[in-house]
Each structure stands twice: as C-alpha cells, then as structure tokens.
Amino acid sequence: MTMDQVPISRSQLPAHLKRLESESIEIIREVAAELKNPVMLYSIGKDSGVMLHIAFKAFFPGRLPFPLLHVDTTWKFRDMIMFRDELAKKLGFDLLVHTNEDGLRAGINPFTSGPSLHTHVMKTEALKQALDLHGFDAAFGGARRDEEKSRAKERIFSFRAEGHVWEPRNQRPELWNLFNTRIRPGESLRVFPLSNWTEFDVWHYISLERIPVVPLYFAKERPVVWRDGTWIMVDDARFPLAPGETPQLRKVRFRTLGCYPLTGAIESAATSVEDILDEMRTTRISERQGRLIDTDEAASMEKKKKEGYF
C-alpha cells in the first residue's frame, strides 16, 4: 500500500474533535504552502501517529509533500522500531532516520552517561544535525500544551533563531488563525499542529479513527524493575541489573514512549483504547510522570528546548 492509497476514515467525529482536526489540517497546509523545505518529526508515539494521520487527510489523495524524520538514539523500545518499520513499509512514506554517530563513538548511553547528557547528545544534538544536514526550515512536532508547563507557553509556530535556539521572550504573537511564517536564512520554525489537543482528545480520536499505535500503550505482563520511583522495563540484554536486582513480571503499560531505560511504566489493566479512555477519566497524574528526562533538574524541559530540543 502506498500513501496515495491510504484509506481515510469516515467516522463521525464530535464537534470539538472536528474543530481540532480542522485546525491541525489548516496548520499543516499552511506550512506546506509557505515554507520551502518542511519535515515532520516522527517519534513513533501516539501523538505522532495522530499527526501523521491528519497529514494524510490534509493532502489526500495526493502524497505527503514532505518526508518524516525519526531521531534514533538506538535506545528506543524494540516494539517501537518494529512498529515504525512496518508502518513505513505499509504506507510507503519517505522516512529519514538519523543517529548521532559522534555520540555512538563516544559511548553515550542512558546508564553510564546519565539522562541529561544522553538526551542532549543523542536527541537534541542529533535533531539539530539532521535539520542542518537536510536544510529543513520547518519541523512539525506532536507536542501538546497540556503535557508540560514550558510547552504550555510555546506558540503553535515556534520561532527558532540561528542554531535552533528557542527564546520564549522573542516569540511572535498569534492572533486567531493568523500565523507569521517569515524567517531569515539560518532561522527556522518548529510547528505543533496538536498544540490545543489534550491527551484524552488524542486517545478519543485514535478510537474513532482506528489509528494503529505501538502495543506498549496497552497493558501486558512485562519484565520490569523498580528504579527511581517507577517501573522500568528490561527490554534487551544491554540493561545492567544492580546487585540483587531481578526483573519481575508485572502487568504494565506506558502512557508516553521514549528511550526505554528512561521511560517508566504504570501498573494497569487497560488492554484496549476504550480501557485507556476509561482509565483516563479517573486519573489525576500527568502522562509524563514516567519520563525521567523531565525530572533531572529544575526547569529541565525549558532548558532543553532553549538548546534545541523538540
């Protein structure tokens, strides 16, 4: 199956999801029309899946006018990489995969290097390398304002100065649906079509549109160890066990996905999208509770974004 053959769902969306979908389509089309060389960042998660699905709708029955980019740290869950490769083969989109080879040669990893250095080298620097290598002037991301406080104040069209630097005080006003896409050479934009969506909106949309997601989002018995106040999955042989530490099988799932040593699971019985929606109706805890990279230092997410992070 190729992109121009992708079936578009005809589900009856509720009014608020229709409004969010229309806004996202308008944003994606605006970037494609105004920027010279955009790219869509694909992290393999649920938000990326929704953003990609909406992009298909925006240009159906034509092909996507931009490639997808996955920054591969080499520490993603195996299920994520398998899902990525199968989806790319099925839909036939143009997928670029970039890894910071300098970081690999230096032996940077989540265990001995720590979350901060690993994230900076293998995610932030790798992303900037890929954007510069291909000359992309705009990058779509699946971030939402309800995820985290620094993202809550970021514009939909997030202006990045030369070197991909984000300065919150220099962001441009966004009045209604009017966006300023003008940039000088060396400058770029990060664009977030799902800014106004919530986690519940995303899962509700996935349910109605029947969008496939990585199986890690659903509860299953998995080998985990208790570290840093959360369950960490032992996904491959590279995981160094502490003295006396033994993986145990627990029925867990993930609300957010990243590098497996830095992503905590939650105990859950949710084995379907409908179960997840039911679970979310009662939860009062942020989905990013399991992201260890968000808790490594004060204001860490804003600091990372200023350095060029997603």
UniProtKB/Swiss-Prot annotation:
Top EC class for this record: transferase
InterPro entries according to UniProt: PAPS_reduct_dom, Rossmann-like_a/b/a_fold, SO4_adenylTrfase_ssu, Sulfate_adenylyltrnsfr_sub2
Keyword Lipid metabolism: no
EC number: 2.7.7.4
Highest taxon above the source species: Bacteria
Known catalytic reactions: sulfate + ATP + H(+) = adenosine 5'-phosphosulfate + diphosphate
A GO molecular-function annotation: sulfate adenylyltransferase (ATP) activity
Pfam families per record: PAPS_reduct
Biological process per Gene Ontology, one example term: hydrogen sulfide biosynthetic process
Pathway the protein acts in: Sulfur metabolism; hydrogen sulfide biosynthesis; sulfite from sulfate: step 1/3
Keywords: ATP-binding, Nucleotide-binding, Nucleotidyltransferase, Transferase
Keyword Transferase on entry: yes
PANTHER family: SULFATE ADENYLYLTRANSFERASE SUBUNIT 2
Assembly: Heterodimer composed of CysD, the smaller subunit, and CysN.
Family: Belongs to the PAPS reductase family. CysD subfamily.
Function field: With CysN forms the ATP sulfurylase (ATPS) that catalyzes the adenylation of sulfate producing adenosine 5'-phosphosulfate (APS) and diphosphate, the first enzymatic step in sulfur assimilation pathway. APS synthesis involves the formation of a high-energy phosphoric-sulfuric acid anhydride bond driven by GTP hydrolysis by CysN coupled to ATP hydrolysis by CysD.
Protein name per the record: Sulfate adenylyltransferase subunit 2
Gene: cysD
